[in-house]
Amino acid sequence: MKDINNIDFSIIRERALRNIREDLIAEWSHEFPADEIGEAFDYVLKLHRDGATLDHFIPVLVEAEMSARLRSGNLWPATAA
């Protein structure tokens, strides 16, 4: 019997981040180049990873920030540059 308490959540987080990236590109590539969305995603992900005390919520935070940037029409706000 497998120990259900021995779960590697980092794999789950990485899969979630990959899916979020792919979904954002699919949804917004008609307004922004896919590579630009990917670069902004990587930047936002790095910001959250560098500042995280607990990494469990990084996918949710990255998705929320990227969605806000995409909706605003500005992937690179002046405060982020």
Q: Where do the model's predicted regions map?
A:
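Charged, amphipathic alpha-helical regulatory modules used
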Residues: 2-81
